[in-house]
Amino acid sequence: QTATQLLKVAHKYRPETKQEKKQRLLARAEKKAAXKGDVPTKRPPVLRAGVNTVTTLVENKKAQLVVIAHDVDPIELVVFLPALCRKMGVPYCIIKGKARLGRLVHRKTCTTVAFTQVNSEDKGALAKLVEA
């Protein structure tokens, strides 16, 4: 129930694929070549993936919600994260399937993801998920 809602919200914050990045940079290069002036695009709010990145985000209190996979193979990789999240006051949840998290960030599997910034329309949905 809440896992599907979480994945729905997370789906909006997927990082761009290789093709999307190529197209974005190509469009920007064409604009620059047409001498329209180069304006760097504002960075969209996006999911951050991986144990090291997520750990840093939690330590700096930048993460708003941490999602941990339950089937990480050497479990020691993520076993410290719930304690760290509790200590830093960051909400966390454990979800079934590292493959589901991997699919969000265009990889095979992914142990942890973290929400950093969230668009205003999803603030309520995220707050509900944190509450549950």
Swiss-Prot record:
Keywords: Acetylation, Cytoplasm, Isopeptide bond, Ribonucleoprotein, Ribosomal protein, Ubl conjugation. There is a cross-link at residues 8, 36 (Glycyl lysine isopeptide (Lys-Gly) (interchain with G-Cter in SUMO2)). GO terms for cellular component: cytosolic large ribosomal subunit. The keyword Nucleus does not apply. Pfam families: Ribosomal_L7Ae (PF01248). The modification N6-acetyllysine is found at residues 8, 128. One of its GO terms (biological process) is maturation of LSU-rRNA. Disulfide bonds: none annotated. GO terms for molecular function: RNA binding. The keyword Lipoprotein does not apply. InterPro entries: eL8/uL1-like, Ribosomal_eL30-like_sf, Ribosomal_eL8-like_CS, Ribosomal_eL8/eL30/eS12/Gad45, Ribosomal_eL8/Nhp2, Ribosomal_eL8_euk. It is found in: Cytoplasm. Belongs to the eukaryotic ribosomal protein eL8 family. Component of the large ribosomal subunit. The ribosome is a large ribonucleoprotein complex responsible for the synthesis of proteins in the cell. Component of the large ribosomal subunit. Interacts with CRY1. Interacts with DICER1, AGO2, TARBP2, MOV10 and EIF6; they form a large RNA-induced silencing complex (RISC). This is Large ribosomal subunit protein eL8. The gene is RPL7A.
